[in-house]
Amino acid sequence: LMCCKFNKVPPILRNEGWLLLCDVNGKTRLDMVSNITGQTYLDILKSTGMPELNHPYRILYTPNSGYSDSPFYLLTADGATRLNKNSFAWKEEYAFKYEVAKQTDLHPQSMICHNAMTNVCVSDGRMYYALKSGIQGLYTEANKQSVLVPYIGSNLVASAFASIYLLYDDVNKCFMSCCPLLPAFGLSNDTYHTMKEMEAIAVGFQGSDMVTGDAFSEYPTGMDFVYMENTYYDPGNADMGVTYTVLRDGQKYYLYGIQLGDMYKSGCPYAIGKAYYGDLSGCKDINKASCYAFSSLRNYMYYAVGGIVYRVNLSEKPLKAEKQLALNGETITMMKFNLYQNGASQHDYDLVVGSENNGVGTLRIYDGMVKEGDFATVKPTTYTGFGKIVDATYRERTN
């Protein structure tokens, strides 16, 4: 259990370690665990000159964003900003409004910067995209109504060209999709379509094999959104990682797995795959789940209730929950699999858990390769002394 605290990170140590986004009485604080020293450093943005930001959402490492000097995005209710790769230093030009057409002051809650051609985000119910063809384009609006949940489904495995993104309209209660390059191909004047429309465009452009899978026949409508997550998990080994979405219909909970490809077939064998369907309603206390996480190693889903983590084997029907671990006296505030960006890593499969007890945050990392996704007997690496952890990302080595 490591809880040493220092306020400032020595520059030489900044090249690798965990970045922990904390909510401290509603204020944003960024803490770090150095993988070099094993020590923790609190409030590392305090002396950077960055204005105080309220209600943190996400901390992202985005080496493919197009901003090589500042590959970190900090997302908060007060807006978003990039951070310098070497010192986390802040400049006014890092403020997200300078990346948006007309310098509109957006407040993105989610962002995907994996694709070679586009960056996308959702802010206040609308999706925005920026094209990266030669020069860094500005973000423009994809849909007019503020109806979208702050999650984006995307293929994180393939190096796609004309990516298709998955969205959920929580007003009209249906999946939607966006392909920013549709107008460039002359396939549609709009980038934003229903799933059935996007399927029809893909089939008309490249043939019937552009849509595959029979896990479900029709896309669901009328259900409430619960959660969405992108994974590297692909049962067909075709660079088509599954995006999972949890939906609720009254007291019933359902899971849909959708594979998202490329309209141009660049690096992807098809455009859309209906990969998975399951009924989660029989899983213990699923209606009380506060956090979800999906493995990229095995077909497993994890969810947290209070301080307890359950695992669901998605390959076994009917779906049922198996208790994995209990953090007595603690409340789990964040749970994820950190998907590494600089290359394949076995640590993609490590379960990362943030918890809180009396205002003190603790980070635990459970090695995913010891029991291949069964964490019940895995002893975690533990760090404590943080604020309430709302997100974490691993700061990988950078040049």
State each model region's role.
Residues 1-75, 344-345, 356-399:
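Acidic/polar, low-complexity intrinsically disordered N-terminal segments immediately downstream
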Residues 60-67, 114, 294-297, 335-340, ...:
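Structural WD40 beta-propeller signal
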Residues 55-63, 69-72, 219-229, 288-289, ...:
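Signature of short aromatic-glycine-proline-rich micro-motifs recurring in repeat-based ectodomains
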Residues 70-292, 296, 376, 388:
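Preference for solvent-exposed, low-hydrophobicity sequence contexts
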Residues 51-57, 208, 214, 219, ...:
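Repeat-based blade/solenoid architectures
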Residues 33-37, 88, 259-261, 314-318, ...:
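Short loop/turn segments that connect beta-strands within beta-propeller blades
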Residues 24, 36, 78-80, 125-126, ...:
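Residue-level signature of beta-propeller blades and closely related beta-rich strand-turn architectures
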Residues 249-361:
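Intrinsically disordered, low-complexity segments enriched in Gly and acidic/Ser/Thr residues
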